[in-house]
Amino acid sequence: MKKEIWGFYPPPIGGISIYCKRLAEKLHAIDESVIMRDFAQSGYESECVMRVKNRILEFLKLPFVPKRLIHAQFTNFYLLMMLYLFGWKHDIVLTLHNRRIVLLDGWKRKVVNQLFRRAKYIIYNDPAYTALLREKYDIDSGKIVLLPTYMAPEQSEVKGLTTELEEFINKHEYSISSNAHRVINNVFGDLYGIDQLIDLMNRLVNEKGLDVGMVFCIADIFDHEYYDKCVARIEELGLTEHFCFAVNSPVNGFEVWAHTDLFVRATMSDMEGV
């Protein structure tokens, strides 16, 4: 039986895509029959990564191909729905990387509930998530597997800092770093706590008189309107020289953290990678 990881290979660079990359490469090194189908359409291909050129067609083919084990890393409802509609022939394993699923209601929740019933295993990374999931969905406890979704980086991933980042960090007496996959301001507020970090820097620099630099790595701005508001707030507080937004930077987040004095993850989202 074929064994496939269905997810997103970087770019875009984010916690889930980096995890998928490392998982696919490590499992393929153990068992060459394990491959990853990349739904990110990044254009990257290797002996263990197969690019999905047409997402819809990939799902439509499922009833007509030999049975396989599919380990899905999706959080997008519509991809989960397609897997439910066309993946009935196959063994399904789901990894839930965040709590977005518990926010679904109505017919969407019913679809996901049916997918959960069909799945062989449901992997998640937060013990506190159990109660939330079982409150919303009819899940057999025997299917639930607690497994941290973190894999340490390989030495081959180390690239070094850009000259711009290195100079910014070195010119300040103290340095703090943080990161976000995207700039998101939703019903829960600022998901990655940029507003809190601005307030923190205001207290440290303007109220306490400390020379601190903040490096904030962002893979994708996404919400440009909110991002512009954050930048305007930084300018208003006179903190422009103390903030560096590394947007879509080729530098690895873990290397930035290693070169700064403190890493802060001001978020309500999952943070096992820290």
Where are these regions (language model features)?
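Short His-centered aromatic/hydrophobic patch
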Residues: A72-L80, L96-R99
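Conserved donor-binding/catalytic core segment of Leloir-type glycosyltransferases
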Residues: E4, L165-Y192, I198-M201
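Glycosyltransferase donor-sugar binding loop
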Residues: F39-S42, N179, V212-D228
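Short alpha-helical donor nucleotide-sugar binding micro-motif in glycosyltransferases
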Residues: N248-P250, E255-T260
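Nucleotide-activated donor-binding/catalytic signature segment of Leloir-type glycosyltransferases, i.e.
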Residues: V215-D220, Y227-S249
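Donor nucleotide-sugar binding/catalytic pocket of nucleotide-sugar-dependent glycosyltransferases
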Residues: R117-E135, I139-T163, N170-E173, N179-A180
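Membrane-proximal helix-turn-helix segments that form the acceptor-binding/catalytic region
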Residues: L60, W88, R99-Y124
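Acidic donor-binding loop of glycosyltransferase active sites
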Residues: H242, A258-E272
